[in-house]
From Swiss-Prot:
The keyword Signal is assigned to this record: yes
Signal peptide span: 1-27
Family the entry assigns: To the propeptide regions of cysteine proteases.
Organism classification: Eukaryota, Metazoa, Chordata, Craniata, Vertebrata
Positions of the UniProt region annotated as 2 X 3 AA tandem repeats of E-W-K: 39-44
Name of the protein this chain belongs to: Protein CTLA-2-alpha
Listed InterPro entries: Papain-like_cys_pep_sf (IPR038765), Prot_inhib_I29 (IPR013201)
Origin species: Mus musculus (Mouse)
Entry GO terms, CC: dendrite; extracellular region
UniProt KW keywords: Repeat, Secreted, Signal
Protein purpose: Not known, expressed in activated T-cell.
Length: 137
């Protein structure tokens, strides 16, 4: 009986500790930049984005981080260090991992896509190619 009471107290302590740890980690994330509030609202409107309260803060922070990367890249572009310009788009609230998962789906093994293809085929042997012709100079 004594062991089960100790186990219960330990479980309760563990649960409280994890809750405090999670709350601490959430508060450790930087707050959104208030100077970007209007731009964030305009971006959400332009791309018809809507989030629940729990997701809004996370998406905003991801968007801000991506915006900083885009601005740094474009500064390099202005100095001629890169050959293309970047801008915000409908994917700007996604992490690179989320973008890959959402846009590319699960990557398939190429063998699964075309399992019956031969390793080698002579295209001339089966008349898939026409004979070569003399080219005028």
């Amino acid at each position: 009986m004594m062991v089960s009471i100790c186990e219960q107290k330990l479980q309760h302590f563990s649960a409280v500790f994890l809750l405090i740890l999670c709350l601490g980690m959430m508060s450790a994330a930087p707050p959104p930049d208030p100077s970007l509030d209007n731009e964030w609202k305009e971006w959400k409107t332009k791309f018809a984005k809507a989030y629940n309260l729990n997701e809004e803060r996370h998406r905003r922070l991801v968007w801000e981080e991506n915006k900083k990367k885009i601005e740094a890249h474009n500064a390099d572009y202005e100095q001629g260090k890169t050959s293309f310009y970047m801008g915000l788009n409908q994917f700007s609230d996604l992490t690179p991992e989320e973008f890959k998962t959402n846009c590319y789906g699960n990557s398939l093994n190429r063998g699964e896509m075309a399992p019956d293809l031969p390793e080698y085929e002579d295209l001339g042997k089966n008349s898939y190619l026409t004979p070569g012709r003399a080219q005028p100079e």
